[in-house]
UniProtKB/Swiss-Prot annotation:
It catalyses: [(1->4)-alpha-D-galacturonosyl methyl ester](n) + n H2O = [(1->4)-alpha-D-galacturonosyl](n) + n methanol + n H(+). The record marks 339 as: Transition state stabilizer. The lineage of its organism: Eukaryota, Viridiplantae, Streptophyta, Embryophyta, Tracheophyta. Pfam families: Pectinesterase, PMEI. GO terms for molecular function: enzyme inhibitor activity; pectinesterase activity. This is Probable pectinesterase/pectinesterase inhibitor 44. It is an enzyme of class 3 (hydrolase). Its main location: secreted. It comes from Arabidopsis thaliana. Residues 1-19 form the signal peptide. In the N-terminal section; belongs to the PMEI family. Disulfide bonds join 354-374. Its EC number is 3.1.1.11. It is found in: Secreted, Cell wall.
Length: 525
């Protein structure tokens, strides 16, 4: 072999190795070893803070304080696990435990969730005496600062180059004729995550009753309580565990813990299978713990179920559904409540053909979330109360989180219709400094005020928030009287709006096909 051929072979091998390394680590701005070392340091601090907090776990006589401490311990545990995922992904980018296969997107999501968890921990002490909060505030502040320093070590999301082609504007929550939607039969070459079985792909669209266990109030199922069925599910399952919940009103608070992966819940329909609770802030619960249904395990799927909180408007924060589940889907479900109905706390989530009702901040949290073809209905609340549909909680400019509401119907629920002239309803308000929400091609009724958006407190966040509107229609979609804030944007073309599509915002093309749910991956279909 000539020296030249030998040199070329070595060069090609070097390029292959170099390309592989770049593929694995080009999402980081620092060497993987340095990134992992920083994570390990933070995990040690988390353990120290947890040790301090655990001393107050049995604090008696103050329900709200007990719940706040319990929340913090859970949230710190969440953060520790999310950091562990991030470290593992950097050491083994092709590992089976990774989320979507896009390691950069996965890592940004998990680090963002860890950051939000600490803020939620502190918020839980609102309304308490402050003694415990003051004892742990310093440690929590240190932890929060360390997590904020970790996020910029991950490269920001690359801007999409492709622009979707224009098409007809959707006229409501149903797809118009000719609208092209993604289906799992479209492209058999789609790469599914390792944990997806072939028969899982159409699970949510199937009309059959294929399930592992069933729940029925009349005793005809395996269990009469939903929580008993959840306990039956294996921990960290790599395959779906399907629970069929028969029709009925289930009066229980349900919590799916972080270790319960890939649980699927199938009901008999909206307002047919109903999970109901009435916890509220006024009755001593933290907002986080007030949820009727809470899910943290990765890969959760729900179909044909209503989640409701019946506490009423006078009880203030009262969550119907809280999700911290990464890569979760809610299909043909309803979330019914008043203030803080749907808590999209953290992680990547997708809602399709759902009904969401409420009054104040009734879609809130710091998840990275897309809503498509949903009915979003404002209700009548307390006298002189203003309705706000969204209150997105992005706290740091490096977080990937935000809300993208698409192809949906924004209107008034039946109880509000007679009071449209006395109850003002807004698209949202900035709960946190970098609040981010966009509305894309929705039908907005006259329930939406001409100015569109509401301040949180004077000029707080008006120049740092990111609110956008693109090609909405209907009586409430007029732009001439919209707010003039520095952070408010009207998208005149698809360049900015493309950043908030399913394919870009939540990397849905990488994981939604595995669920079988229909979705629109662009702006024009």
């Amino acid at each position: 072999m000539s020296c030249l051929k030998y040199f070329l072979i070595l060069l090609m091998l070097g390029l292959c190795v170099s390309s592989e390394e770049n593929f694995q680590y080009d999402y980081l701005k620092v060497p993987a070893s340095e990134f992992v070392s920083s994570i390990n340091t933070i995990v040690v601090v988390i353990r120290q803070v947890s040790s301090i907090l655990s001393q107050f776990a049995d604090f008696s006589g103050d329900r709200r304080l007990q719940n706040a401490v319990s929340d913090c311990l859970d949230l710190l545990d969440f953060s520790s696990e999310e950091l562990t995922w991030s470290a593992s992904a950097s050491e083994n980018p092709k590992g089976k435990g990774n989320g979507t296969g896009d390691v950069g997107s996965d890592t940004r999501t998990w680090l963002s969730a860890a950051l939000s968890n600490q803020a939620t921990c502190m918020e839980g002490f609102d309304g308490t005496s402050g003694l415990v909060k003051s004892l742990v505030a310093g440690s929590l502040d240190q932890l929060y600062s360390m997590l904020r320093e970790l996020l910029p070590l991950v490269q920001p999301e690359q801007k999409p180059k492709a622009v979707s082609k224009p098409g007809p504007i959707a006229k409501g929550p149903k797809a118009p004729p000719g609208r092209k939607l993604r289906d799992t039969d479209e492209d058999e070459s789609l790469q599914f995550p390792d944990w997806v079985r072939p028969d899982d792909r159409k699970l949510l669209e199937s009309n059959g009753r294929t399930y592992d266990v069933s729940v029925a109030l009349d005793g005809t199922g395996n269990f009469t309580k939903i929580m008993d069925a959840i306990k039956k599910a294996p921990d960290y399952s790599s395959t779906r565990f399907v629970i069929y919940i028969k029709k009925g009103l289930y009066l229980e608070n349900v919590e799916i813990k972080k270790k319960k992966w890939n649980i699927v819940m199938l009901g008999d329909g909206i307002d047919v299978t109903v999970i109901s609770g009435n916890r509220s802030f006024i009755d001593g619960w933290t907002t986080f713990r007030s949820a009727t249904f809470a899910v943290s395990g990765r890969g959760f799927l729900a179909r044909d179920i209503t989640f409701q909180n019946t506490a009423g408007p006078e009880k203030h924060q009262a969550v119907a559904l809280r999700s911290d589940s990464d890569l979760s889907v809610f299909f043909r479900c309803a979330m019914r409540g008043y203030q803080d109905t749907l808590y999209t706390h953290t992680m990547r989530q997708f809602y399709r053909e759902c009904t969401i009702t409420g009054t104040v901040d009734f879609i809130f949290g710091d998840g990275t979330v897309v809503f498509q073809n949903c009915q979003i209905l404002a209700k009548r609340g307390l006298p002189n109360q203003k309705n706000t549909i969204t209150a997105q909680g992005r706290k740091d400019v490096n977080q990937p989180s935000g809300f993208s509401i698409q192809f949906s119907n924004i209107s008034a629920d039946a109880d509000l219709v007679p009071y449209l002239n006395t109850t003002r309803t807004y698209l949202g308000r900035p709960w946190k400094l970098y609040s981010r929400t966009v509305f894309i091609r929705n039908n907005m009724s006259d329930v939406v005020r001409p100015e569109g958006w509401l301040e949180w407190n004077a000029d707080f966040a008006l120049d740092t928030l990111f609110y956008g509107e693109f090609m909405n229609y209907g009586p409430g979609s007029g732009l001439s009287s919209r707010v003039k804030w520095p952070g408010y944007h009207v998208f005149n073309n698809s360049d900015q709006a493309n950043n908030f599509t399913v394919s870009q915002f939540i990397k849905g093309n990488l994981w939604l096909p595995s669920t079988g749910v229909t979705f629109s991956d662009g702006l024009y279909i």
